[in-house]
């Protein structure tokens, strides 16, 4: 990425191509000559100021061209990529949402929360359909189904044992791994039990149902296979189980780059290499989405690299590093596999929450890459957020305005924030009716595509 031109380029010169079985065992295969610098893609100058200047060497390192290797010439024009991204047709979905009141529209862009349940993500009828799933889109509109969303990453994370009584279905066990809750304090444990669908009152099941799902290998293990075909087979398995359980969007795969062993998500974040991570995640995506009505939610978009203070931490990244490294794997998946959904990360990028960045969500993701799916937040639960730090947690109205269609899992505080911005009562952000309609229409379009009408 050339920051001066806001474009990806290949500079003029000779490129030595090496081939072999590993990085330690290669031989020169050819020398490719580029007579002049080629502009591969024209992009936008976005993503903010990191507050520092990238180090650049005084001069590029010179490598002697190997004798005897074939020499090939490439015309710069042949490397040009003109990606025409047609706007998604929202005509029918807009016609649906334009008839809704402001109050109804505000529900459309939130998860299907239960009134008064500020810390729950198993809400509405989700516990009746797939107990232990992380959440769902709204169920408040007749004739508009909900999108059911079980978490990942190692298969579908749902409650393995379900009890059914006169009030409906409920989880007998948490879908979190055994021992996980032992690391939490009592307040956090209660919040997570609530999120996972465990009843907060004594209930005696009249009938028991088992819904065990297959555990697939963790992300790093899949990536170590170097096999997009294996990844696709595992995605196919998950897609088949989504068919069985009636899930629509799997909240996986995740693939920010490994930078430090201290990142708590490295086990699912595939690789330190953007090409490998992108190709493996694309394989998983193709496997799941070969099943009609099933989709992945690639995450966490983007630049997340720590769990501590992750709702309020800021990643400072140069535009070149962002384009060449940290966004590259996401770009590969979007262009090659067309995922149905993407989840933003908690962190900020150069001072702006990724979930509140129109430059990231509209300019890069949709305008440059041609993403046509649904964008949702990571789960912003009231008990987890803090607003007294240098970087307060993200809130609903700026998130919706920026191009994030679903603020998850949603609560009444989030809805009132949207309505306040819509009425011009929020000093920080103003949300227009047309902006809210567009985001709601994107939700409706995906519901129709995956769950029908």
Set out the residue ranges of the language-model regions.
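Intrinsically disordered, low-complexity Pro/Gly/Ser/Thr-rich segments with frequent PxxP/GP/PP motifs
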Residues: 1-6
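Short beta-strand elements
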Residues: 25-43
């Amino acid at each position: 990425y050339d920051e001066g031109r806001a474009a990806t380029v290949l500079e003029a010169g000779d490129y030595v191509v090496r081939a072999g079985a590993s990085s330690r065992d290669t031989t020169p295969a050819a020398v490719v000559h580029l007579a002049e610098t080629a502009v591969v893609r024209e992009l936008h100058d976005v993503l903010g100021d990191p507050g520092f200047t990238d180090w650049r060497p005084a001069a590029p390192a010179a490598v002697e061209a190997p004798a005897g290797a074939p020499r090939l010439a490439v015309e710069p024009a042949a490397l040009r990529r003109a990606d025409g991204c047609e706007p998604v047709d929202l005509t029918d979905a807009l016609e649906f949402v334009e008839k809704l009141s402001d109050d109804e529209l505000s529900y459309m862009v939130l998860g299907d929360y239960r009134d008064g349940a500020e810390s729950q993500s198993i809400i509405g009828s989700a516990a009746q359909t797939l107990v232990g799933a992380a959440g769902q889109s709204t169920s408040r509109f007749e004739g508009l189904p909900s999108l059911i969303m079980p978490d990942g990453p190692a298969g579908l994370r749902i409650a393995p044992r379900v009890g059914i009584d006169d009030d409906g279905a409920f989880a007998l066990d948490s879908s979190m791994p055994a021992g996980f809750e032992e690391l939490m304090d009592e307040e956090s444990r209660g919040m997570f039990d609530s999120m996972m669908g465990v009843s907060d009152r004594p209930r005696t099941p009249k009938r028991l149902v088992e819904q065990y799902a297959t555990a697939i290998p963790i992300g790093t293990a899949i990536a170590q296979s170097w096999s997009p075909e294996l990844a696709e087979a595992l995605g196919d398995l998950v897609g088949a189980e989504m068919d069985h359980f009636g899930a629509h969007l799997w909240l996986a795969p995740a693939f920010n780059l490994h930078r430090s062993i201290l990142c708590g998500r490295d086990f699912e974040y595939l690789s330190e290499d953007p090409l490998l991570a992108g190709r493996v995640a694309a394989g998983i995506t193709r496997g799941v989405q070969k099943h009609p009505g099933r989709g992945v939610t690639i995450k966490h978009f983007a630049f997340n690299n720590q769990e501590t203070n992750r709702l309020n931490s800021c990643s400072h990244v140069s535009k070149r590093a962002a384009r060449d490294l940290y966004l590259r794997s996401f770009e590969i998946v979007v262009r090659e596999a067309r995922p149905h959904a993407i989840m933003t990360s908690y962190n900020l990028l150069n001072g702006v929450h990724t979930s509140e960045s129109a430059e990231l969500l509209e300019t890069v993701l949709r305008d440059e890459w041609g993403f046509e799916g649904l964008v949702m937040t990571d789960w912003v639960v009231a008990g987890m957020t803090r607003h007294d730090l240098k970087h307060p947690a993200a809130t609903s109205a700026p998130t919706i305005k920026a191009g994030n269609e679903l603020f998850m899992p949603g609560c009444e505080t989030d809805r009132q924030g949207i309505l306040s911005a819509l009425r011009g009562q929020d000093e920080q952000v103003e949300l227009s009716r047309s902006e809210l309609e567009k985001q709601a229409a994107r939700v409706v379009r995906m519901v129709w595509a995956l769950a029908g009408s």
